[in-house]
């Protein structure tokens, strides 16, 4: 089986009417750390395991 490169795309919203954002993290451990730091202030989060790498993608909140 081929060892494919991947990253985690986490899309989130801080409150029902609040800002939404997206961050790219390299591994599930990083996702867990982010959730532990930010979980209390997140209304929802969507986690996607994406093929490839996150080079050139910018974390943002709008």
Regions found by a protein language model. Name each.
Residues 13-16, 34, 51:
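N-terminal start and proteolytic maturation junction detector
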Residues 8-10, 25, 31, 35, ...:
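Hydrophobic beta-strand residues in large extracellular and virion-surface proteins
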Residues 1-19:
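Short aromatic-glycine-(Arg/Gly/Cys) micro-motifs in beta-strand/loop hairpins
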Residues 17-29:
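A short, exposed loop/beta-hairpin motif centered on an aromatic-Gly-Thr core
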Residues 36-62:
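Short, mixed-charge low-complexity intrinsically disordered segments
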Residues 2, 20, 31-32, 48:
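Generic alpha-helical structural signal
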